[in-house]
Amino acid sequence: GDDVKSACCDTCLCTKSNPPTCRCVDVGETCHSACLSCICAYSYPPKCQCFDTQKFCYRACHNSEKEEVIKG
């Protein structure tokens, strides 16, 4: 679906098994769009992390263009 296509992750950890088990460990105000199991800490702003595991990593959220925009 579109949720999986638009999902992104900057920090993805995978096991060395075959197939690998991968998990996105990004912490942010929301979880990525394809996340089914999103756990958020009651803080302001909230700190959320996705606890889904899958056999792949999503593409990185930050490409060089976005980083330049943030720095500017």
UniProtKB/Swiss-Prot annotation:
Disulfide bonds join C8-C61, C9-C24, C12-C57, C14-C22, C31-C38, C35-C50, C40-C48. Gene3D superfamilies: Cysteine Protease (Bromelain) Inhibitor, subunit H. Keywords: Disulfide bond, Protease inhibitor, Serine protease inhibitor. It comes from the Eukaryota. One of its GO terms (cellular component) is extracellular region. The record marks K16, S17 as: Reactive bond for trypsin. Transmembrane segments: none annotated. GO terms for biological process: negative regulation of serine-type endopeptidase activity. One of its GO terms (molecular function) is serine-type endopeptidase inhibitor activity. Dimer. Belongs to the Bowman-Birk serine protease inhibitor family. Inhibits trypsin (IC(50)=0.9 nM) and alpha-chymotrypsin (IC(50)=1.1 nM). This is Bowman-Birk type proteinase inhibitor 2a.
